[in-house]
Every structure is written in structure tokens, then in C-alpha cells.
């Protein structure tokens, strides 16, 4: 019996290294999926609005500690004092080597969920104005969180394949474009080191599960919020000649702004100017004293952004002068400092390198190069304005291929991100995100 036991022990010692050597990002993702799906469903059922991610951040901190990270909680300095510091950083060290930042976002949206899922959100919370709103993970940040935790678990078990320091960043308030800046303002790079690379991911509502999609160079836009007050001289609607009508003037200004896009801008430099809100007046027969407008302005290049914002101001005031508005009643144009998101730039060389890694891990047919979008993403803050930190934010598909084909055949649009009906397929989405992120980190930190 003793000899037999000794043989079993020797055999187990001989086999163990080979078992460990067989661990891969794919096998570890598969092994962790059941518990990660449970986390995903829990987070999906308990969404929290931007700046109020108390429960979510505590859950992420707990999981990062369990994955072997040294965790710091309650990071973030906001301009808005209503928001508490719910940023979380987990540091995983493995000797000398490069530092790689891995980021997830955590916040949800004021959307009334209509997916019909058994774990659908029923949460109602107070928004910034104190009003009750339904809350939903309508942008897939719950899938990001689960994949983020899965990545930390996998990289802990693959420490023999990498060296250096991984800084896991769980960021609040992405949806309002404030979270990344709040963490950097709180000394993220001073306290945890400026990374050599920064990586992020996001689910995509029109790409099939199992696929990674990525954009080279500019991937998302500068986002500026502009408030404009068009002033006039009000009066009776029957006597417009005795007034300076700000309603007609506002209409002229809106049309003139579109010439910035069509006639004053290089068509190879995308620009979007959208007037999302216009309000003025109180009654049918009263010409008001002012009209208020709210704009969103989207650009890529910093020099284009500066010129377009200046043009918006110039045209508004020029139209007012042409309408005979006194100089002391010129339009007031204000670019918000609270809701600005910089354009996201995927470093071309790093993107090329990681595309090769993903094709090897997932197959050539499962990696797509996609066009940039005019949406905003505050992951852009991590590469800094001078793009001095090579960064890539990639997408993972979240929709079943059969569903994509079904909607295409019917000529219908799939539920988009931020839709009350958006429901990613969790298992393959989260698995692909883990494999994508883990293989990227391993390549950048390989021994």
C-alpha cells in the first residue's frame, strides 16, 4: 500500500505541471463562466446611476480582492458635489515589467427595462434632480464588469506567463463623461503609476457574439455640450414689427450652423452639430424675449473642435447682428465644462499588434476592423491629451448571429445600446471579452 501511495503521489507531482501548462485564457474563461454569469445577473438586477455606484463598486472591490489584487476604494474627485467617490483600483503585481491599465465602467442608465428577462431590473432610484426614475444596464456595463472580474481571475492563474503590474480600474460615471476625469483628478497615475499601456472594452449591439471588433486611430468623437440663449425684444404676436423676434432668429441660426458642416468644414473631417432642445415662449400670441437651445457637437481632431465651437459662437452673434439685435442683447453661447468627452484614439501600432493576437486566439474570421463612430467614450481620458499612453478600447459582439440575420431579413433595426429592449447574450459575450482582454495583456506583458 505504501508503495502504491508513493507511486500515486509521484504521478500526481509529474502530471500537475502539465495540467497547469494547459491552462489558457479560453479554458479559464470557460471554467469561470458559471460564477461570472451569476455576478452578471446580480449586477443587471441591481443597476445604479452614474455617481451612485455604491453597491456595484463594493461588489467589484470584493471580487478583485478575491482575485489577489491590492484594492483601493472610494476614488474620484468630481466637480458635482452630489457624486460620491466610488472608483475602485485593484493592483496585481508580478515582479518587474511593464504596467498595464485594464478598465471597466460600472454605471447604468435612467431607462425602464422592457427585455422580459427573468433577472430584469425593477430598480427605481432618485436622479440628480431628485426625481424617481427607472434604472437599467442598457449599455452592457454589467457584461463589462463580469468580464473584468473574469480577466483578473484568469491573469492571477497565468502569472507564470507575464511580469509587471496590472492596474485594474473600475470606473464610475462613464455615462455622463465624468468618471475617468474624476479618477485622474484624484491622482490615479500619481498613486498607482502611469501605465505603459491602457486597455478597455465595450459590448457592441450590432456585432455577433464570439467576435471582436476594433477601430484604428480615432474611434469615438469629442463630445461638447453647448447652451445658447438667443435674446430679442418681446411683444404682442400681432405686432411683430415692434419686436425683435428671437424665435425666427433662432431658426435662422440653426440653419446657418449647418453650413459649418456642409460648407466651412473639410468633408474628410467629420463634424456633427445637433440641436437637441429648443424652448421659447409661453403662449400663442406672445413673442418671447428669449429662446434657449441645447446642442451636442461632435468632432475628432482638436483643431477642428476648436474651430467649430468658435464658428457656432460667431454665426449666432452674426445672425443676431444682421437681425438688428442690439449688441447688449447678443446671443449667449456657453460650452459646458461639466459634460466634455475627448475623442478616443486607438493607437494604430498597438491596435495592429493586438489584432494579430486576437486572430490567433479567436480565428481570423472572428476579428473585425470597423469604422469610427460619432458617439463619446471617456476611456479617451486614460491615453491623455497628447496620446502619450498607447491605448486600445475594443468591442466584443453581444448579439446572436441568428438574431442579426432575422432582423436583417425583416428589414428591422436591432435594439441599440441605451434601448429598453437591449439584452446581450451573456455567456459568449463575456467569454469573448475575457479571452480578448487576457490575451492582450499577456502579449504586452509576456516574459
Sequence positions of predicted segments:
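Metal-dependent amide/peptide-bond hydrolase catalytic core
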Residues: 248-447
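Bacterial N-terminal signal peptides
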Residues: 8-18
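Divalent metal-coordination and catalytic microenvironments
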Residues: 43, 64, 90, 102, ...
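Positively charged n-region of N-terminal signal peptides that target proteins for export
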Residues: 1-5
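Acidic/His- and Gly-rich active-site-bordering loop/insert found
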Residues: 22-137, 146-163
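Histidine/acidic-residue-rich, glycine-tolerant segments that coordinate divalent metal ions
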Residues: 87, 124-136, 142-143, 155-277, ...
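Soluble non-cytosolic domains of exported or imported proteins
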Residues: 30-34, 47-58, 142, 146, ...
Amino acid at each position: 500500500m505504501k508503495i502504491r501511495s508513493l507511486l500515486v503521489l509521484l504521478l500526481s507531482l509529474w502530471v500537475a505541471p502539465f495540467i497547469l501548462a494547459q491552462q489558457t485564457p479560453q479554458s479559464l474563461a470557460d471554467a469561470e463562466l458559471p460564477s461570472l454569469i451569476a455576478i452578471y445577473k446580480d449586477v443587471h438586477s441591481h443597476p445604479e446611476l452614474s455617481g451612485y455606484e455604491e453597491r456595484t463598486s463594493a461588489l467589484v472591490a470584493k471580487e478583485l480582492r478575491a482575485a489577489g489584487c491590492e484594492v483601493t476604494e472610494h476614488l474620484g474627485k468630481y466637480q458635482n458635489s452630489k457624486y460620491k467617490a466610488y472608483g475602485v483600483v485593484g493592483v496585481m503585481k508580478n515582479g518587474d515589467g511593464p504596467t498595464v491599465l485594464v478598465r471597466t465602467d460600472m454605471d447604468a442608465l435612467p431607462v425602464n427595462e422592457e427585455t422580459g428577462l427573468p433577472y430584469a431590473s425593477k430598480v427605481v432610484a432618485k436622479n440628480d434632480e431628485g426625481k424617481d426614475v427607472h434604472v437599467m444596464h442598457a449599455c452592457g456595463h454589467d457584461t463589462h464588469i463580469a468580464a473584468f472580474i473574469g480577466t483578473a481571475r484568469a491573469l492571477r492563474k497565468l502569472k507564470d506567463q507575464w511580469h509587471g503590474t496590472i492596474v485594474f480600474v473600475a470606473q464610475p460615471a462613464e455615462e455622463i463623461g465624468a468618471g475617468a476625469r474624476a479618477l485622474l483628478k484624484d491622482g490615479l497615475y500619481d498613486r498607482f503609476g502611469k501605465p505603459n499601456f491602457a486597455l478597455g472594452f465595450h459590448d457592441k449591439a450590432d456585432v455577433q457574439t464570439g467576435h471582436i471588433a476594433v477601430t484604428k486611430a480615432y474611434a469615438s468623437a469629442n463630445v461638447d455640450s453647448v447652451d445658447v440663449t438667443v435674446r430679442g425684444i418681446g411683444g404682442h404676436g400681432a405686432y411683430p414689427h415692434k419686436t425683435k423676434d428671437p424665435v425666427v432668429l433662432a431658426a435662422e441660426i440653426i440653419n446657418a450652423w449647418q453650413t459649418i458642416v456642409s460648407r466651412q468644414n473639410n468633408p474628410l473631417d467629420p463634424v456633427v452639430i445637433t440641436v437637441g432642445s429648443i424652448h421659447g415662449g409661453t403662449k400663442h400670441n406672445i413673442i418671447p424675449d428669449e429662446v434657449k437651445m441645447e446642442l451636442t457637437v461632435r468632432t475628432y481632431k482638436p483643431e477642428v473642435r476648436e474651430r467649430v465651437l468658435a464658428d457656432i459662437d460667431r454665426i449666432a452673434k452674426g445672425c443676431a447682428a444682421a437681425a438688428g439685435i442690439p449688441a447688449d442683447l447678443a446671443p449667449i453661447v456657453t460650452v459646458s465644462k461639466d459634460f466634455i468627452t475627448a475623442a478616443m484614439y486607438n493607437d494604430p501600432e498597438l491596435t495592429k499588434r493586438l489584432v494579430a493576437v486576437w486572430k490567433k486566439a479567436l480565428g481570423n474570421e472572428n476579428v473585425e476592423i470597423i469604422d469610427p463612430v460619432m458617439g463619446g467614450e471617456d476611456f479617451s481620458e486614460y491615453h491623455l491629451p497628447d496620446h502619450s499612453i498607447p491605448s486600445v478600447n475594443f468591442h466584443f459582439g453581444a448579439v446572436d448571429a441568428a438574431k442579426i440575420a432575422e432582423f436583417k431579413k425583416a428589414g428591422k433595426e436591432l435594439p441599440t445600446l441605451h434601448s429598453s429592449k437591449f439584452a446581450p447574450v451573456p455567456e459568449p459575450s463575456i467569454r469573448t471579452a475575457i479571452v480578448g482582454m487576457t490575451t492582450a495583456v499577456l502579449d504586452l506583458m509576456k516574459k
